[in-house]
Amino acid sequence: MSHDCRCNKCKSVIYAMLFRIYDDIEFKPKFDEASVHLENYEGTKVYRSLRKIYKALQDYRGIKHFVKVKNLCQSDLYIPSKKILIETDESQHFTEARLEALNNYPKGFIFSYNVNAYKQMCVKIKSKDRDPKYRDEQRAWYDTVRDFLPQICPTKIKKVIRIPLGEFKWCELNHKKEEDVAKFKKLLKSECIWRK
């Protein structure tokens, strides 16, 4: 079931559901230890993997410089008690650059979302954001660093969950109804929110 990926009510319902389920949610968290500059990871266990992905993004369209900030910008939601970071992804996250990054993740990388479905969405949606011209590579790189946060700052983050917007009509759920809360929990644990 496809739906408008920019439906503001969907995002509001997701947030309301999460606030209903968890007591300790931080909105728009920032992790200062999460640098987006590759050289800051030299000597760490993630450096080789990140270097391979970064190089693949540089080679994708020949754009070499797409990192313009020091650290990751704010994320969507963080549940400190569970050490879970939650990202809600609109269509602009499903690009060829993101597919290039995902295809270069190390074998055995543990995802907390269905990466194969995510790759399929990149192929199908092929979103493009050329303003500025490096934006697709930049977003793909920042998403990559977020995916690696459990390795970068394991004392704060155990997993990163990505919820694709537009794959389910979240706006039809009511956070005040127990049956909808139960349905929301089930959807988050299943793959039915992903386009087949």
Regions from the PLM with identified roles:
Residues M1-K196:
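Nucleic-acid endo/exonuclease domains
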